[in-house]
C-alpha cells in the first residue's frame, strides 16, 4: 500500500491536471459566522495542517476537483466534498470566526480524468483517501452532530457583510446567476476571476532556508488576497504503485535524515494564486522509480496531460520540459501539537495537569510517542519530570515562578512539538490594617506654656503608612493649626481648655486606623496662701521665752505680709512680742498658763490666710539628774594616765555638782579634777579599778554611776590593713568609696589614714574628710590610675599600710556626647521641664524619647546651663556619632521657630574634642580647635571654603615655597606683559609720509604706484594719482623727488617715458 503522503500528492497532481484541462473554477457565495452539519458517513472532510487565510483556503478547494466547499474555521482550513446539498447547508451561529465559501465548477468533467480521479479517491479508506476519518473530524470539530435549532438561523446583518468584504476583497462585477455551466450554488457578488487548478502538494521549507526559486511561492504573503492569483509552476511527487517496487532506498533514507536536521519535511496542501490560465502544457516523460512532474502554466486548449501511469520511455520534443529522474525523498509529516493554553495558578494551589493534543490523530493500530521536557523553571525548583512519556503530565509541589514545557510527539513518519507556559504566582497577601499610635496620649499644660507636640510617627503597618491626618474632635478653636497631614502635630497659641485630637493613618492598601490624644491646658491660677504658724509648744518654768516660726507658710506666687497677734482668749495676758510682721515671732516674759497666737499672711493678690498656734507654759517640775560615767575601759599596762568622762550626765534644769571617787582597786591612785565632769587618774597598775561619779542639780537631787577600768598586761600584735585592692571605674561614673573596714587588730584600731600616692592624678575630691575614717569617699575623678595608701594604727601605736588602686577608664560613649548650652539657670531647670525638653529634642532628631539619654546637667554660668546627652539608635543599640547629632540638631534648629524649645539655645557642640588634626597637632578641649605642631598650619581652603573643619594639613615649608614660586611667576608674567606692550607700541610708531598728486603720469606708472588691495589714502582725490612722499623724521629740510633725478638714475625709464608720454619734464617744489 502506498504511503498516504504519496497518494495525496498523486491525487493533487491529477486534480491539478484535470483543473487545467477543463473550464475555470470560480468562487461562489461566502457565508460568515456560519457552520455546516454534514453527515460524516457520506461527506468527506479533509483538514489542511497549515493555517491559511480565507482566500487561500478557497483556492485550495478549487485546486481539488472533488471539493465543493472551502470551510475556514478558527484559523484552520477544511476542504469539504458535498455529494448531497442538504449536508452543506450553511447555518448561522453566534459571532465566531467561521467562513463558508462555495466553489463553482462546470457540470461536465473530462471522462478520462474523472475515471482516474475516482480510482485514486476510492483507493484506501472508505471515506476517500484525502478525507480524514469521522472520529478525527469529531475530535477537531466537537460541535458537529449537534441539533441546531431553527432560531439560530437568521439573516446576515450589515456588519457581517462588511466583515466579509474586508476579508475577501470582492470586485465590483457580478457573474450572472443561472448559467447552465455551473451548479445552483449561490454566486459570490463580484466573483469575476477564476481559480487555476494547476497546483499540487509540495514539501514546505522554512522561509529562512528556502533556496529553490521554483518553491519560492510558498513564502509569498497571503495577508492581502486578490481576486486574481498569479501563475506559477510547482514540483509534485508522484506516487509509486506496488508494481514499481520499493520507493525509498537506504541511501535515500540517510539523505532524508541529513536533510531533516536542517529543515523538517512537511507535507502541506498549498493553494494556488494564479490568473486564469490560457493553456497548460505538460511534457510527456518516462516515469521511473520516483518521478517528479513539472507542471508549467500553458494553454489548456491544445494540450491535455496524460496521467503518470505509463512506465514506457518517450522522447521529448523541443517544447517539452525535461523531468529529472531523481528518486522522491521520504517525507516526514508535520504534526500539529498543542499542550493547551498557558496556565496561571496561584499558591497554595501548586498542582496542574498538562495534556498534549495532536492533529491529525494517529492512524489505525499506531500510536504517537510523547516526550515532555522542562525548558525553563525557577532556580529554587528541585523537582523532576516523572512519567514524561505519556500524553498527560501531572505536576505538583510547584514553587513561585515561570515554567516552560515542551512536548514532542513523533511516530515513524510524523513529528511535531508544542510549548506551554505555567506561571505560579505567590499567595495573595492579606493586608493588615495599620495601627495608629500617638505619643503622649495625655498632656497637661499650664499657662504661660501655649505650645505642644503630639507625635504619631510611631504608628506601624505591615507594609507602609502613606498618609497621616489630624483633626480636632473637640476643644477651643485653634487659630494656628499646623502640620495636620504630617506624622507630628505641632500646636501653638493654645487657649485654656480640654482638647481632643484624632489621628487617622492610611496604609498603601487604603486601610485606615484612628486613635485619639488628649491635651489639657490650665489657666494660670492664683491660689490663696496657706498660713502655717508651726506646731504647738510646751515650755516649763523657769523657761519663759520661745520663738514661733511661720516660714512654713506657702503661696503659689509670693507672701508679702506676715502679721502676728494674740488669739481669742489671750488678749489680756502678759507677754512681750517681737517681730510681729516677720515670719519669726519672739516671745518672752511669759507666765504660767496657755497662750494662743494667730498668724495672718497676705500674698501679692491681697489674698489672706490665718493659722493659730498654742504655747503652754507649765509650772516648774524638777526631775533628778542622770549620771553617766561612760563605758567601761580596758587598758594595757603600762598606763600613764586614764581619763574619766562624765560630761554625758544630764538634768532637766542642769547639773551643778560633779564628784569622782575611787571605790576599789589593786592599788591607790592619784586623781585630778575630781569635782569636774572630766577627771584624770594616774598610777594605775595591773588589775581592775572601780570609780563612782555623783552628780547633783540645783534642787539638790543627785544621781550616781560606776565606771570599771581594767588594766591588763599583754603582748601587742600590730594591726593588718586591708585597703580593698583594685577597682575599675568607667566614666561618667566618677565617684567611689574605698572600704578599709576589713582591717583587723588583736585589740582595737584607733585611727585610719588614707594617703594619695604622688604619681596619682591630683583631680578628685575627698568627701567630708573621709580620708581619716574607715571608708574613703572620692568624687570628681578623672581618667587615669589612682593609688591610695591606707595606714591603720592600734591603741598601742602599732600600724600597718596597704594599697588600693582605682583605674578610671574613659567613657565609651565619649564620641557620642553632645553639649547643649541653654539660656536658663541650672536651678530653674526642673525635672518636668527637662522631660519636655527631651521630648522636643526627640522630635527634632526623629527618634524616640527613650533614645535620648541625658548624662549630665551642670551650670555653665549664672544664666546658662549645659546639658550633656547622647542619642542611641534602635535595637541593636548603638550610640550615634556626636558630630552627626550636633550637625543634624543645628540644622533642624535653624529651620524651626526660635521658640520651638522651652529655652533659647546658645551653643550646640560635641562634649569632647574629636578632631585628629591630620596627625600634626592636638585638639584643644576648650576651643575645640586644632593646635598645630611646629612647621605645620591649617588648610585654609578646607577651613574657610569647604566643610570648615579645623586641621593641620599644610606644611609651612611647602606653603612658603609655593608662595615664593607664585610671586616669581606673577612678577615674570607682569614683566613679560610690559615688554610686549612696549614692543607693540614701538612697532606702531612709523614714519609719517606726505603725498602730493602728480598729474602727468602714464597708465603704467599709475598701475605701479596704485595702493595694494585697492586701499586709498584719505588725502588723495583721484584714484590714479601718483604720490610723492616726504619724511618728517629725517631732517627739517624736505627731500624733493623730481622726474629728472629719476631719469638720471634710470635711463631706461626716461627713454620709455619720453617715447610714451612725450618730452620729459621737471617736477620740483616750486611747481606745486
Swiss-Prot record:
Glycosylation sites: 196, 219, 262, 394, 421, 498, 513, 536, 551, 733
Annotated region (Disordered), positions in chain: 168-277, 295-327, 1045-1072
Highest taxon in the source lineage: Eukaryota
Disease: Dyslexia 2: A relatively common, complex cognitive disorder characterized by an impairment of reading performance despite adequate motivational, educational and intellectual opportunities. It is a multifactorial trait, with evidence for familial clustering and heritability.
Segments on the Extracellular side according to the record's topology features: 21-955
Function: Involved in neuronal migration during development of the cerebral neocortex. May function in a cell autonomous and a non-cell autonomous manner and play a role in appropriate adhesion between migrating neurons and radial glial fibers. May also regulate growth and differentiation of dendrites.
Protein name in UniProt: Dyslexia-associated protein KIAA0319
GO biological processes: central nervous system neuron development; multicellular organismal response to stress; negative regulation of axon extension; negative regulation of axon extension involved in regeneration; negative regulation of dendrite development; neuron migration; positive regulation of SMAD protein signal transduction; sensory perception of sound
Compositional bias (Polar residues): 254-265, 1053-1072
Residue ranges annotated as motif Endocytosis signal: 995-998
Subunit and partners: Homodimer. Interacts with AP2M1; required for clathrin-mediated endocytosis.
A GO cellular component entry from the record: clathrin-coated endocytic vesicle membrane
Keyword GTP-binding listed: no
Coiled-coil spans in chain: none
Tissues where this protein is expressed: Detected in adult brain cortex and fetal frontal lobe (at protein level). Highly expressed in brain cortex, putamen, amygdala, hippocampus and cerebellum.
Domain called MANSC: residue spans: 21-99
Membrane spanning residue stretches: 956-976
Leader sequence segment: 1-20
Extent of Low complexity compositional bias: 311-320
Record PTM text: N-glycosylated. O-glycosylated.
Chief subcellular location: membrane
Compartments (UniProt record): Cell membrane; Early endosome membrane
Protein topology in the membrane: Single-pass type I membrane protein
Residue stretches making up the PKD domain: 341-427, 435-524, 530-620, 621-714, 720-811
Amino acid at each position: 500500500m502506498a504511503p498516504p503522503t504519496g497518494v495525496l500528492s498523486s491525487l493533487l497532481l491529477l486534480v491539478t491536471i484535470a483543473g487545467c484541462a477543463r473550464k475555470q473554477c470560480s468562487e461562489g457565495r461566502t457565508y460568515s459566522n456560519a457552520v455546516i452539519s454534514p453527515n460524516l458517513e457520506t461527506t468527506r472532510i479533509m483538514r489542511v495542517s497549515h493555517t491559511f487565510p480565507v482566500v487561500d483556503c478557497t483556492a485550495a478547494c478549487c485546486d481539488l476537483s472533488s471539493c465543493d466547499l472551502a470551510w475556514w474555521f478558527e484559523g484552520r482550513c477544511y476542504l469539504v466534498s458535498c455529494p448531497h446539498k442538504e449536508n452543506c447547508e450553511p447555518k448561522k451561529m453566534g459571532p465566531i470566526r467561521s467562513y463558508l465559501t462555495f466553489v463553482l465548477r462546470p457540470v461536465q468533467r473530462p471522462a478520462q480524468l474523472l475515471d482516474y480521479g475516482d480510482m485514486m479517491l476510492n483507493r484506501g479508506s472508505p471515506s476517500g483517501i484525502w478525507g480524514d476519518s469521522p472520529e478525527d473530524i469529531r475530535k477537531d470539530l466537537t460541535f458537529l452532530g449537534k441539533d441546531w435549532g431553527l432560531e439560530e438561523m437568521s439573516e446576515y446583518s450589515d456588519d457581517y457583510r462588511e466583515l466579509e468584504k474586508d476579508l475577501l476583497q470582492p470586485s465590483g462585477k457580478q457573474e450572472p446567476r443561472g448559467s447552465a455551466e455551473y451548479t445552483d450554488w449561490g454566486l459570490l457578488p463580484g466573483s469575476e476571476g477564476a481559480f487555476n487548478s494547476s497546483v499540487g502538494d509540495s514539501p514546505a521549507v522554512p522561509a529562512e532556508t528556502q533556496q529553490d526559486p521554483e518553491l519560492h511561492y510558498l513564502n509569498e504573503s497571503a495577508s492581502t488576497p486578490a481576486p486574481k492569483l498569479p501563475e506559477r509552476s510547482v514540483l509534485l511527487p508522484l506516487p509509486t504503485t506496488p508494481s514499481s517496487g520499493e520507493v525509498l532506498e537506504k541511501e535515500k533514507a540517510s539523505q532524508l535524515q541529513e536533510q531533516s536536521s536542517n529543515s523538517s519535511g512537511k507535507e502541506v496542501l498549498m493553494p494556488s494564486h494564479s490568473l486564469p490560465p490560457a493553456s497548460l502544457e505538460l511534457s510527456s516523460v518516462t516515469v521511473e522509480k520516483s518521478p517528479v512532474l513539472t507542471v508549467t502554466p500553458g494553454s489548456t486548449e491544445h494540450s491535455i496531460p496524460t496521467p503518470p501511469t505509463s512506465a514506457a520511455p518517450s522522447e521529448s520534443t523541443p517544447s517539452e520540459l525535461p523531468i529529472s529522474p531523481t528518486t522522491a525523498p521520504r517525507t516526514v509529516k508535520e504534526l500539529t501539537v498543542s499542550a493547551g493554553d498557558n496556565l496561571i495558578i496561584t499558591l497554595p494551589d501548586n498542582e496542574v495537569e498538562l495534556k498534549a493534543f495532536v492533529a491529525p490523530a494517529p492512524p489505525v493500530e499506531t500510536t504517537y510517542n510523547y516526550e515532555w521536557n522542562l525548558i525553563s523553571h525557577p532556580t529554587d525548583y528541585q523537582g523532576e519530570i516523572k512519567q514524561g512519556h505519556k500524553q498527560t503530565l501531572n505536576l505538583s509541589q510547584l514553587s513561585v515562578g515561570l515554567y516552560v514545557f515542551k512536548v514532542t510527539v513523533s511516530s515513524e513518519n510524523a513529528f511535531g512539538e508544542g510549548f506551554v507556559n505555567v506561571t505560579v504566582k505567590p499567595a495573595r497577601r492579606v493586608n493588615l490594617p495599620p495601627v495608629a499610635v500617638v505619643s503622649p496620649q495625655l498632656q497637661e499644660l499650664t499657662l504661660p506654656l501655649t505650645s505642644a507636640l503630639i507625635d504619631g510617627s510611631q504608628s506601624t503597618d505591615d507594609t507602609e503608612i502613606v498618609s497621616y491626618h489630624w483633626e480636632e474632635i473637640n476643644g477651643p478653636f485653634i487659630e494656628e493649626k499646623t502640620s495636620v497631614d504630617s506624622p507630628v502635630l505641632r500646636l501653638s497659641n493654645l487657649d485654656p481648655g480640654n482638647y481632643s485630637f484624632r489621628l487617622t493613618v492610611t496604609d498603601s492598601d487604603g486601610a485606615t486606623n484612628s486613635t485619639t490624644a488628649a491635651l489639657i491646658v490650665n489657666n494660670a491660677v492664683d491660689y490663696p496662701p496657706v498660713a502655717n504658724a508651726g506646731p504647738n509648744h510646751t515650755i516649763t518654768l523657769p523657761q519663759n521665752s520661745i520663738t514661733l516660726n511661720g516660714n512654713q507658710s506657702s503661696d503659689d506666687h509670693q507672701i508679702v505680709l506676715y502679721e502676728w497677734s494674740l488669739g481669742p482668749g489671750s488678749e489680756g495676758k502678759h507677754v512681750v512680742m517681737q517681730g510681729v510682721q516677720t515670719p519669726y515671732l519672739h516671745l518672752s516674759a511669759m507666765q504660767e498658763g496657755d497662750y494662743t497666737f494667730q498668724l495672718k499672711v497676705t500674698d501679692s493678690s491681697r489674698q489672706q490666710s490665718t493659722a493659730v498656734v498654742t504655747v503652754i507654759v507649765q509650772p516648774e517640775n524638777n526631775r533628778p539628774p542622770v549620771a553617766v560615767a561612760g563605758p567601761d575601759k580596758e587598758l594595757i599596762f603600762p598606763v600613764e594616765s586614764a581619763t574619766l568622762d562624765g560630761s554625758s550626765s544630764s538634768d532637766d534644769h542642769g547639773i551643778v555638782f560633779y564628784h569622782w571617787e575611787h571605790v576599789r582597786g589593786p592599788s591607790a591612785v592619784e586623781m585630778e579634777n575630781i569635782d569636774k565632769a572630766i577627771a584624770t587618774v594616774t598610777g594605775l597598775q595591773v588589775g581592775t579599778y572601780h570609780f563612782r561619779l555623783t552628780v547633783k542639780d540645783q534642787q539638790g537631787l543627785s544621781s550616781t554611776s560606776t565606771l570599771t577600768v581594767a588594766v591588763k598586761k599583754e603582748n601587742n600584735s600590730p594591726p593588718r590593713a586591708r585597703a580593698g585592692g583594685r577597682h575599675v571605674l568607667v566614666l561618667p561614673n566618677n565617684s567611689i568609696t574605698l572600704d578599709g573596714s576589713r582591717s583587723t587588730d588583736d585589740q582595737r584600731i584607733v585611727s585610719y589614714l588614707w594617703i594619695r600616692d604622688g604619681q596619682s592624678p591630683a583631680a578628685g575630691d575627698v568627701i567630708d574628710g573621709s580620708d581619716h575614717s574607715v571608708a574613703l569617699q572620692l568624687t570628681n575623678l578623672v581618667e587615669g590610675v589612682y593609688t591610695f595608701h591606707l595606714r591603720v594604727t592600734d591603741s598601742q601605736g602599732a600600724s600597718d599600710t596597704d594599697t588600693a588602686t582605682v583605674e578610671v577608664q574613659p567613657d565609651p560613649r565619649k564620641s557620642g556626647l553632645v553639649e547643649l548650652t541653654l539660656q536658663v539657670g541650672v536651678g530653674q531647670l526642673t525635672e518636668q521641664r527637662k522631660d519636655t525638653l527631651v521630648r522636643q529634642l526627640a522630635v527634632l532628631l526623629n527618634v524616640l524619647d527613650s533614645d535620648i539619654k541625658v548624662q549630665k546637667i551642670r551650670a555653665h554660668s549664672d544664666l546658662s546651663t549645659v546639658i550633656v546627652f547622647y542619642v542611641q539608635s534602635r535595637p541593636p543599640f548603638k550610640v550615634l556619632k556626636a558630630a552627626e547629632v550636633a550637625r543634624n540638631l543645628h540644622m533642624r534648629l535653624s529651620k524651626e521657630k526660635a521658640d520651638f524649645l522651652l529655652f533659647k539655645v546658645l551653643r550646640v557642640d560635641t562634649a569632647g574634642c574629636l578632631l585628629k588634626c591630620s596627625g600634626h597637632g592636638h585638639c584643644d578641649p576648650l576651643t575645640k580647635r586644632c593646635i598645630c605642631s611646629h612647621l605645620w598650619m591649617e588648610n585654609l581652603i578646607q577651613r574657610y571654603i569647604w566643610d570648615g573643619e579645623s586641621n593641620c594639613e599644610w606644611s609651612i615649608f611647602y606653603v612658603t615655597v609655593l608662595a615664593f614660586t607664585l610671586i616669581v611667576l606673577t612678577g615674570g608674567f607682569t614683566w613679560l606683559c610690559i615688554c610686549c606692550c612696549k614692543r607693540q607700541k614701538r612697532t606702531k610708531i612709523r614714519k609719517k609720509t606726505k603725498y602730493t598728486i602728480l598729474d602727468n603720469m602714464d597708465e603704467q606708472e599709475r598701475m605701479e604706484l596704485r595702493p595694494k588691495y585697492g586701499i586709498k589714502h584719505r588725502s588723495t582725490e583721484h584714484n590714479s594719482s601718483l604720490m610723492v612722499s616726504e619724511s618728517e623724521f629725517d631732517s627739517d629740510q624736505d627731500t624733493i623727488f623730481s622726474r629728472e633725478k629719476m631719469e638720471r638714475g634710470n635711463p631706461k625709464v626716461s627713454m620709455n617715458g619720453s617715447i610714451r608720454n612725450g618730452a620729459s619734464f621737471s617736477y620740483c617744489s616750486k611747481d606745486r
